[in-house]
A protein has these predicted regions:
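Helix-rich terminal scaffold detector
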Residues: 1-5, 165-294, 298-303
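Short, low-complexity N-terminal leaders and the immediately following helix N-cap/first helix
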Residues: 1-66, 117, 133, 319-343
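Predominant activation on well-ordered alpha-helical scaffold segments within soluble catalytic domains
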Residues: 9, 13, 53, 109-110, ...
């Protein structure tokens, strides 16, 4: 019996578990979830540093106001200060350079005049002026980035500053895709009478990559039960997830569900009260491998991926698998179907009163071009036959 979209999503999340960890280089860690807490092994910065280009001095030398000091050297970023500051002396310093011993203030260049041998400070400065103390940004031992955090550019920079070149992140799910149908032909090959191009394979493969999965295999099988068992069985080896398209309904040539049963996979649900995508099926193996059997119609396959596979991949990657809808206003009527949640492909605009949506062209499940330019899905509840123009509607953004 078909289940509601809410119950289907909840069932998926009950079975989608966070995967184990792996260490990756920082350049490969963008968008990954940190697997363990990152504590600072040392202070950042590790030494007192200059915040300005200028001169390192002793603040006491300016207690009486303007002062002329003898230049005794230079401190550059990236090198230890090779000279100390004593009363009556100063050291030229660059931004980020270590503050020389004896200095306790930095005077910006624009507050001075210099003839190369001496520097005159315009007025009194206080201790600590433009000095970045050790640990100003991060203290040694501090918890800086917590486990489960999605690593963005700022997080990568912070980890680098803490000398963590290979953070431990949640492993990417290994995903296989299997298309079904005698009629499918690869792009670039001659098209026989009655055949069609396999658009689902490339579309779902791209969707897997975009959602953070690792596509390890993309296979196809004709409309034969024993062949389907063999191909799916091989595709299920050493993966975390299998996604099939087509062959999931109740016709005489639909063999995916019987094949999965023969392979020992238990159906969690078979059918969702959803338009398009009603035949969508979800099964789980004894080892926890997830199988999403999506319809063959291109739009239905992509809808099923967005609504059910993406939350599963998010959860497996250590992200939140919850997808919270946003309120919007329908600028045109949105047709629903009582008894099923109807998902309308839309384009959005942000206006003064919030988000507005308009449906794309034909909402038929075989019109793949209706997905072009779509940035949101509008959800017409299963107890409504439509949403009128000007009425509120829940939407989920897609990216």
């Amino acid at each position: 019996m078909a289940v509601s979209i809410e119950d289907a999503r909840a069932a998926v999340l009950r079975h989608a578990e966070v995967l184990d960890a792996e260490d990756v280089f920082l350049d490969d860690a963008l968008g990954r979830a940190l697997a363990v807490d990152a504590h600072a092994p040392n202070d950042v910065p590790p030494f007192a540093a200059s915040a300005m280009d200028g001169f390192a001095i002793r603040a006491a030398d300016t207690a009486g106001g303007a002062a002329t000091l003898r230049l005794v050297g230079e401190a550059k970023a990236g090198a230890a200060a090779g000279v100390a500051v004593h009363s009556g002396t100063a050291v030229r310093i660059s931004t980020g350079a270590p503050v020389p011993d004896g200095a306790d203030a930095i005077v910006p260049q624009e507050m001075t005049t210099s003839d190369g041998a001496t520097v005159t400070v315009d007025g009194q400065v206080a201790r600590g002026y433009h000095v970045r103390p050790p640990g100003e940004d991060i203290r040694s031992g501090e918890l800086v980035v917590g486990a489960g955090t999605l690593l963005g550019p700022a997080e990568l920079g912070v980890l680098a500053s803490m000398n963590i070149p290979r953070p431990s992140v949640v492993r990417r799910p290994r995903v296989a895709i299997a298309g079904t149908g005698d009629e499918l032909t690869d792009p670039g090959k001659p098209l026989a009478p009655g055949a069609i191009r396999d658009s689902n394979g490339p579309a779902l493969g791209g969707a897997v990559h975009r959602a953070g999965g690792e596509l390890v295999a993309r296979v196809r099988v004709g409309d034969d039960l024993e062949a389907t068992i063999s191909v799916l069985g091989a595709a299920l080896r050493d993966v975390d997830m299998l996604i099939t398209s087509g062959g999931v309904s109740v016709g005489p040539h639909d063999h995916v569900r019987p094949a999965l049963a023969r392979l020992g996979y238990s159906e969690v649900f078979a059918g969702v009260k959803l338009k398009p995508g009603r035949p969508t099926t979800f099964a789980v193996g004894e080892d926890g491998t997830l199988v999403f059997a999506l319809p063959g119609n291109p739009v239905s396959a992509l809808m099923g991926f967005r609504l059910f596979v993406v939350p599963a991949l998010d959860a497996m990657l250590g992200r939140s698998g919850e997808h919270h809808p946003v309120k919007a206003t329908a600028d045109e009527p949105l047709e629903g179907a009582v008894g099923r949640t109807t998902v309308i492909r839309c384009r959005t605009t942000l206006q003064d009163d919030g988000w507005h949506v308009r449906p794309t062209k034909s909402q038929d499940s075989h019109i793949l071009t209706s997905m072009l330019g779509v940035d949101a899905l509008a959800l017409v509840p299963e107890d409504r036959d439509g949403i009128g123009a000007g009425e509120p509607v829940e939407i989920e953004f897609v990216g």
